[in-house]
Amino acid sequence: MNGHDSCVLVTGGFDPIHGGHIDYFQDAKLLSTYLIVGVNSDEWLRRKKGRPFMSWESRKRIIDQMNIVDYVIDFDDSDGSANDAIEQCLKDFDKVIFCNGGDRKEDNIPEYEKYKNNKRVEFKYSVGGGKTESSSELLNA
């Protein structure tokens, strides 16, 4: 998967994927030439929402077909973090730029404590602008 020194990593359930996610991907891609999308597992969604609306395979297939996306990974951290996705990227890249959407900050993401002193991990916030749509709200409308 490599050939690049750094990657930008975005993570989420993307269940279902919507326009706000596209903004998130496009904004993130401006930070590095290699965009990796970490898609939460079905088990993660069961713990968070009760059940997935779309299977991991379906979500992965849709995201994988987007020209802006270079690689899709799955991950499942029982603590609600994306630490597993970050670790997967650190195996192949010298630097990981971990992006967070508009509603996330260093004081409300579990990954910050683990990686705040790791010079190979850089945190970016408000990527993709403010939260304009919510998958949960779309499903409950």
PLM-predicted stretches and their roles:
Residues 1-141:
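Nucleotidyltransferase catalytic core that binds NTPs
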